[in-house]
Amino acid sequence: NGDGGEVTPSSQEIEQAVRLTQLPPLDAEDRALFVDRMLPADLAQEAYASGAYQPLRSWAHAAFAATVRSSSEAVEITLVADGLTKVLRFANDGTLAVSYRWEAAAVPHGVVFATEVSLSHPLELRTTPSAETWSFPIATVAKSERGLDQTVQGESVTLRWPAAAGGASIAVG
């Protein structure tokens, strides 16, 4: 002791003091750019952000057939899987455009098509048609000598369109 009466807590005392008031959000799927899902119409943003939901359909682990086309202006990668076509266009000027087509007739009324983008830095996303945007911080929780530390790693941005639209596009940058 000898330092003015302050007592350093024991490792057992620190361990007992480590408590979460709520569980951190669960990532049911890997974080990446353009993780595509069909979501229920009544899904609340809070449930989505916490990971406490089931997508109606997810292409996160789908095996896509890929076709690559190159021109003097851009490289286009067309991905097709299970009723979804996604085209990634990488232009020579460094811009990226992503376009989607899905089978709207096969989707129940009110369902939402969504794509999630996990970002470490802000990025401008322009959508056609205009998308509803949900965002929340991506954070990790780790135990340290101070207790539990929460570190923000980036931001999740989810772009949402009525599935009845049958398609959408995003310009990045």
Which stretches of residues belong to each language-model region?
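Short acidic, flexible loop segments centered on an aromatic residue
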Residues: V112-H121
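Glycine- and small hydrophobic-enriched segments that form the cores of compact globular domains
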Residues: N1-S58
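Beta-strand-rich recognition/accessory modules
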Residues: N1, M38, D42-H109, F113, ...
